[in-house]
Each structure stands twice: as structure tokens, then as C-alpha cells.
Amino acid sequence: MQRRDFIRNASLALAAFGLPSLPACAASKSGQMGLRRLGQPQPFDFATLKGQARALAQAPYKSHKRVLPGRLEGLDWDQYQSIGYRQDHALWADQPGKFQAKFFHLGLYFHSPVRMFDVVDGKAQELAYDGAAFNYGKSGIKDGELPADLGFAGFRLNTRKDTDRDFAAFLGASYFRAVGKEGQYGQSARGLAIDTGMGKPEEFPDFIAYYLEQPSADSETIVVYGLLDSPSVAGAYRFAITNGDVLLMDIDSALYPRKAIERLGIAPCTSMYQVGENDRRMAWDWRPEIHDTDGLSLWTGAGEWIWRPLLNPRNLRFNMFVDRNPRGFGLLQRDRNFDHYQDDGVFYEKRPCLWVEPKGEWGEGSVQLVEIPTVDETFDNIVAFWNPKEKPQPGQELLVGYRLYWGAEPPARPPLAHCVASRTGLGGVVGKKREYFSWRFAVDFEGGELARLIDKGEVEAVVEASRGRVEIVSARPLREINGYRAMFDLVPPEGSTEQIDIRLFLRSGGKTLTETWLYQYTPPPAGAPERTLY
């Protein structure tokens, strides 16, 4: 599987598929400040965009990637980051509404021009690229050096009260991200994932055009439309984005496959996990923990709540959680303690959770989790998405709706106690010689009824393992969090390095008290340091 090689294939000429194609000289005069408009406004709505996507799917796929002109092709990270969009060219900056949009320049990883349209009163008009709209900083690029029809890489949204801080950004392939009140970017979402974690190159669809609908003066929501294209599928997306303490994206999509898709990923979440409390395989850094998110949360169609801590595995790891009509899932950052990260530059403790809430019934399928080894926090190595059981076929229309919530807390939480920490280490009894290898797990739960049961001592830990032996099981009050700590040792089969699946929950008198904690443990090979400590 390819990692980080996801920025590919953006739009060039789409006139044959329903988008107007106009030369720069056809730019129309506009009373609005900022970018010029091209041609005359054309009627536009979501049905129009679906028609464009359907037409794309009926034609052979053509790559949208291009070689960038001049110095753009060789920019490094610092040079690209120094290119900024000028406030006096921001879209809607002169309008009475609360929001405005700014645009990203092509360069670095972003080689695919994306067409931008302004939608006013149900009519769309393309926005013309203008080099004068950018400050080129340390890039070495001079105003007027680049072609007049270069195009954009993406866009960002902010409020007119805070023109320097984004609350959402769409940039690269079909990637987009947003923030809650903490104002810190972290994980990303994608329009679609195709063949992720299959041991072959992943396909990364591109948003090749965006239509930004001008909001009314008192609107709290901004609507964005995206046209998606890839070798396997074309699609139309509608995003209704409501900024707030928890940012909401209400999404409707229509997909039109060009060919059968082996593994289709709906509502994909993309994150990074390098080092955490439970997995210290890559703990070479001075910081105790390094991750955008620390676990996958699932609310199944049957009503069960599941928490699966993330891992940075030695080899690519793929898991599927079979379900029917899931109620929600997401990659969460539950650990909000700065002391656990000690990074005052990127603030991992402020990074948003991303919760997916299906609209309607999604039927049979599975939430799939892909974990990829990484040695660097700049590599996104975690992907979670919904994979429908029925594989979409060419000629079909697949309609999918869902909501994305970005913020410190997801909108849905277990009524039971939830896991707040998962720690692991060498097993055995302190002060006694270890006769065999074992690995210890300490899992902390808080919430629900646990605080009421602290003084009653009626809580037990229920642990199951797919192989090996579980021993020294306990559930003890943890007054510091008004909760409980479950502990147990796992003894793998002698000489085995085969993966072991573990399931844990707390109960009292036959009543379940916590969400279900799932884990995958791989015993170390013979000669590994942890096997020599007994």
C-alpha cells in the first residue's frame, strides 16, 4: 500500500462533462471585490452536479495531474507554506454574511488544478485564478511569473471576525479537515477511499471542482459542492457546514462507478498514531505520546459500544467489524492531558475527534480499520471507513448520506462507563521470579455507574482471549478518576508470535457496566528484549 502518495489527479479540461470551459479572456466584470468571474452565471443545484458526475462516469477516465510551470514544481515545504492568500481577495469578504473563503496555491504535493465556482441565488460562475491574489513569501516566485490560467489547489473557510484562523479546509485529492472550538487541526476525512489496505497501490479520488454557495447574511451554515473523479468512480457531494464548538458537516453523496470496486470506503477517517500509552514500540522520541487519535469507537446497529485502542504495528494490520445499519463510528482523541504529550507546538491534546453518523440505514457491511507501521508523525498511518457488503457495479447510482462531527467530544457517548486509558507492560508478580513470559494489561474505565460502586466491591472484569491463557485478573476501584482499573496478564502459547484478540468489559451481578474493550496483541519473537526480562 502507498502512504502519503495520495496527492494526484486533479482537474484540467472538463467541458465535455457539463462544466463550462472558458478562456481567461472571457472573464466578466463583477461588482464584487477579489477574483474575476468567468463567463455568465449558469443555473446550478445538486441535481446539476449529479448530472456532471454521471456524465463523467460514462466516459473513459483521464488523469487530471499536470506538471507545474516554473519554480512551482520544485518548492520545498517552507517555501510552499510561505505562500499566502490576500485578505482583500477573499471570496465574500465584501458581503454581509459571516463567512469567507480563501484559496490554496498549487505547488509542493499539490499538482492538480481544481476549478472553483461561486454560487449566488442558484447560479454558478467560475472564479479565475489571479496570481496577484497571493503573497509569494519565500517561494522566490514573482507576481506575473505564472500562467494566467494556472488554477487553484483547494480552499479554506474562516469567519469575517477571525480572518486568519480556518475552521475547515479542502486540499489534496479528496481530503478535507475541520476543527472545533479548540482550533487545532488533526485528523482528516476523505470523500472516498478505494482499495485501502489491500497490499496494492491505493486509488485516491480527486475533487476536481468545488462550488461554494454564498451564504445569506444571517446564515450559520455554508454549503459547498464537490465533483469527484477517479479511475473507478465519479461522484457528486454536498457539504452543509455549520461552524461551532463541535463543527458539523451534513453530507450527501451520489456515486457512479466506472467499474467494479473491490473495497469501497465510505466516510473514511485518516489519522496518525505513532506512540501511546498502550503501544511504545516507536518510543524513541522525547515526547511521551505522539498521536492525532488514540482509539476507534463503534456504536453498532445492535446497540453495543466498542472501544478499540489504536496501534503502530510492525506490519500492516487490517480489521473489520461486521455490522448492520451502524449507528456511528469514529476515530477519537480521548486523552486530553497536555502532560501526556508535552508538545507545545502541535498540541496533540487539542486535536479533534471525528465522529461519523449515518443518515438512514446503511444495510450490511463492516467498519474497517487499517493500521500501517510508521516511524514518523508526518505519515498518516490510520484509516477507518464503512465498507458496504454489496460491491457497487458500473451503471449503478449509490446514494449515501452521513454527518461528520469535529470536536473534543463526539455527540454520541456510551451510557455505560468508557475507557480512558489502556496501558501494557511486562507481566508477572513483583518480587517473584518469572518462570515464563506474560504481558500485562491495565485498562481504566470511568463514568456510568462505576463511581457509585467504588465502595461496594461488586465489580468484576470479564476477559476473553482468542489464544493463550489469561491470569491474575482483577477489577479495582481507582478513586483518582472515580472509576475502576481492570488488570490481567496474558500468557501467549509457547514460542508463538501469532496475533491474539482480546475482549474485556466490567460487570456487576450480571449487569454490564462498561463499553467493550477490544485489543490485538502480537507476542514478541524469541530473543526480543521483553522476553529476556525473566
UniProtKB/Swiss-Prot annotation:
InterPro entries listed in its UniProt record: Gal_mutarotase_sf_dom, GH-type_carb-bd, Glucan_biosyn_MdoD, Glucan_biosyn_MdoG/MdoD, Glucan_biosyn_MdoG_C, Ig-like_fold, Ig_E-set
GO molecular function, one term: carbohydrate binding
Signal sequence coordinates: 1-26
Subcellular location: Periplasm
PTM statement from Swiss-Prot or TrEMBL: Predicted to be exported by the Tat system. The position of the signal peptide cleavage has not been experimentally proven.
Recorded GO CC terms: outer membrane-bounded periplasmic space
Transmembrane segments: none
Pathway recorded for this protein: Glycan metabolism; osmoregulated periplasmic glucan (OPG) biosynthesis
Pfam families (alphabetical): MdoG
Keywords in alphabetical order: Periplasm, Signal
GO biological process, one term: beta-glucan biosynthetic process
Function statement: Probably involved in the control of the structural glucose backbone of osmoregulated periplasmic glucans (OPGs).
UniProt record similarity statement: Belongs to the OpgD/OpgG family.
Protein name listed in UniProt: Glucans biosynthesis protein D
Source organism: Stenotrophomonas maltophilia (strain R551-3)
